[in-house]
């Protein structure tokens, strides 16, 4: 019997570990979806209605949209602050505590946007309040991504980390699908009612999503890697400063990797709605295409994550960055056909192929660049500083280019530049995958 006991114990331990990991994955994905719903609902509203509701009327409707995306970019400027604050909390007090606070702040800010008066009702106070709440959203989202990724990747077996870490991004896709779906439902209202009050519904509905998300996060177990570091007395008193001191190159690499991934994503998923209006494509067609593309990408990113466990992180990420450059012009060619199937194809290729290969690999890749005691701070700092220039500025630059040239080709060239920055970064980034024994 003595010889059987170790085998029985190991099986029980493996089953318990598998159940715990599954619970962490499900809870993390659900919590991430709740938070990213709040974040993406602003991006959709900025593309569709915020320009005419919160900014002075002008002869060129793109000017109002430009103002809405400027407020969108301000949220990204606040993200590094969130990365520093919540990275410190996550490395000092645990990933779980940080994630609960990010969701609380995001929920309050998003619900508040749904209560704001418009420019016609309150004048300049309206865009000022919008910017203030957008800043709060930015602070919360700055601490969200790194924590959500690490909760899964730090509990996953090394040989399957790419696959499991990719699951964290399903929350991002899920939040986007939920927010776009909410706006599709709201747009079923007559246009006048949608502009008068219907646009508020997706923001006000976030209170239900927010409450569920807090409950889910509060009941998450702590990261296994963090608990081991804490028990060994290896937590840092000043993790952000230590990350900068010990991992300056890795932080720069994380920033460069983010440029094509984040910048491309917001051009495909946010700016495309603006371009659709410019090109005379029905907004319902564009929203449907975006939702379809995100659903397809949610499955694709898992496949890319698994492939990164087999081939390595760098080759898979390179596929995405190079594909982004290749798709820069064909993406708009397909949109300009005004054919719904070809529009759907453009969005699916842009997201599932180009962006999917990068976002499916990024969580494991950047997490493996940093040591446990400063990992949250290092990941958050590199990820969120890049967000200012990539996600925050990309749709703003794209709208400005479209407004000035009234053509898509400058935006295509800009997409190619984003891809080139990441390709060069990959050439200087070390492979982090641990080969299977």
Please annotate each region the language model reported:
Residues 92-103, 310-322:
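Cytoplasmic membrane-interface "Motif A"-like loop-to-helix N-cap segments
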Residues 163-184, 382-394:
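Glycine-rich segments within core transmembrane alpha-helices of 12-TM secondary carriers
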Residues 315-361:
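C-terminal transmembrane helical hairpin of 12-TM major facilitator-type secondary transporters
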